């Protein structure tokens, strides 16, 4: 769908070319108006052109406006030094809503779908998922949903840590304690901690662990059998969390790339990209002060080798057009080095294919890194369980008469929605404060606020005995609240574009929060049932319902018919 922003950009671009043909190409600065009384959109380019054209911004604005057709607008005004304020006509907005309703059902398909690989979540085998995995899982899932919605072919990869020294330690510990049936073990994480202590304190244990790493890499049957059982137990616990979060992933761990590591190093050497540094094989880049080490001095490979092999495989075998890796911002330098290496080797054809989607920390209410009182990472399973229980407490407080059956159904939805929305509504680059009290509020920019607006629409349907609301048909706009709601609905595809361009879900959460506020104002100001404009207003309700439902789905949130 052609968004209002792209439509207006095209008009202004054409007008500037006609008014000032001597100008070279320029990037236009057109934005939604900051205040409603300024109109719908604002063009600020007259100020930028003043120096090049040696004219006043206002005179430039007047010439631009003279070349813009008046038909789609109710007004085009020049304000201040040369701001051009555009207000679309009500008839134009009504016609655009007809197109919007059709495109919304299809998902605003892109003209050139791509193969997009999104690598996210990626916990380590034999360790509990903790709050640090929450952001990667939630952000990655949201981006995957958005890319899929507009028609891209998305592969969701879980690059789990299923190889390395840790497994040598675990296998050795299990052999020592004669525990060969891992499925009988309740807490693999505790075993890992015990094995880690032995590894650090007992040189003989460390030696046997290193031997078992080699045995595992060589395909020793006993070592492989134990490794497979360890992975199966861990993946089962991961899947429990993914089911709660309603997240789908295809597991392709680090071990998958083992057969390709030697060839990757050899290929980089053949391209004269490798330098020996203290016995280690490294790839140096002029723009970075440190290299990417791809083979240790003892001949072993590391996670950087695996990442290079994974990048090559995803381009050459998966035929990816874009690759996103969602991890904390602390790994930014590593991924810059990885991209530079893969570009130099030709594994990435050009810049822009790969993006590291970094994110900040989760903090407690004191502004410290979110941990237990003893300083350990908070287990994600415990965090989700607590969210569900606190959501149930909130429901009991607001509805003392709620049945246990309703509580059991609604509690998990409200709790998980709250956690997801609180995370996604924060700019992913920023740290954010985790507060159950704030995220479970019924007012403000919360999941509960979105859900309340959606439930209000369901109430309209029940009260008027309607199974569904109209999402197409003739529409006339009469009241300011109708016009504002129509304009907000039409901004959904451009917000989706922005979310995908910047890889930032908070643009979508901000939009949905604004939409709920505009709908609530419409509901307050515009009588629906029995009014002269009942059908048109039900149409606006129907489009709001579908847009809210779609937006919440893209965030990974679930809806309810009542609260």
UniProtKB/Swiss-Prot annotation:
Swiss-Prot/TrEMBL catalytic activity:
tRNA(Arg) + L-arginine + ATP = L-arginyl-tRNA(Arg) + AMP + diphosphate
Which residue numbers does the motif 'HIGH' region cover? 123-133
Quote the subcellular location field of this record.
Cytoplasm
Domain of life, per lineage: Bacteria
Question: Matching CDD domains, A to Z?
Answer: ArgRS_core
Species of origin reads: Chlamydia muridarum (strain MoPn / Nigg)
Q: Mind telling me which HAMAP family this protein's record contains?
A: Arg_tRNA_synth
Cite the entry's keywords alphabetically.
Aminoacyl-tRNA synthetase, ATP-binding, Cytoplasm, Ligase, Nucleotide-binding, Protein biosynthesis
Query: Keyword RNA-binding, does the record have it?
Result: no
Question: Quaternary structure per UniProt?
Answer: Monomer.
Pfam families found in the cross-reference section: Arg_tRNA_synt_N, DALR_1, tRNA-synt_1d
Q: What protein does this entry describe?
A: Arginine--tRNA ligase
- SMART domains xrefs: Arg_tRNA_synt_N (SM01016), DALR_1 (SM00836)
Show the GO cellular component annotation of the record. cytoplasm
Q: Which GO terms describe its molecular function?
A: arginine-tRNA ligase activity; ATP binding
EC numbers: 6.1.1.19
Please state which protein family the record places this protein in. Answer: Belongs to the class-I aminoacyl-tRNA synthetase family.
Q: Which GO terms describe its biological process?
A: arginyl-tRNA aminoacylation
